[in-house]
Amino acid sequence: MNIPFYIVDVFAEKKYAGNQLAVFLGADVLSTEEMQKIAREVNFAESTFITKFEPENSVAEIRIFTPEHEMKFAGHPIIGTSWVLMNRIFENQPEKITLSVPIGKIPVHQSGDLVWLQAAQPEFLDTFLAEDFLSFSNLSSADFDDAFPIQEVTTGSAFVIVPIKNKKALEHLILDKVKMNEWLHGHCKTNHRALYFYCLEETKLISRMLCIEDNQLKEDAATGSASTCLQAFLLKYHAEEIQIINHQGDFINRSSQIYFDGKLAENHFDIKIGGKTQFIAKGEWEV
């Protein structure tokens, strides 16, 4: 049995940048175990499996897997899968579609060469002290931007948002894997434990996402779900309206640009992230 698949680069201004994604069509014939094995074989940050789609209604259901586990929500897989559906699968090439993922329905629209998703309302969880990070990083107290808190935020997947003062500290960041993992397990209430460092330097937003997967310290080239959390954080603490590009992946040679368009009004967060997707390849997977 063969099923078609596509490979794309997401949040990429050009090919061979951004975050890689494998998209599998006709995945309703696969078991959960088979999906996990395929995701592990591909070994991208995430792979998606389209289990149902209705072109006439511009809707689809997908499942998202890292090489280790299934995700309830993740940004770059939703953006990339939507691009594939709208530009390679749906013959009518709709500008708007709805993707169903485990946390619910995600509205997606395409405007020019950008695909945008609308995120769920955020939850702001625990705050932490900068001193906590001194035990498992090379950061000093002076490297943290104390104008903002350090806080775990979720819009479906949770991230600890860590404000850093400048690009130099962000670029030269070093983390102790063992001590970081102990801290995450001891302090994060959610099962998705990851750190999202950022700095705002001369109006440029730069970020890094680091987590422990497969007992390894890993850095993500572009993290849409973390970007929705960061956008919510900036709307709450920085400005009630934001249009900016989040630059991620610069320090691992996978330059990514994640577009922010957000507003906060009467405690309602309007969080949208967008990005460009580059088509890389298509083929058939022998199951």
Q: Would you name each region that the model predicts?
A:
Residues M1-F73, I79-V287:
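Active-site proximal loop and beta-alpha junction motif in alpha/beta enzyme cores
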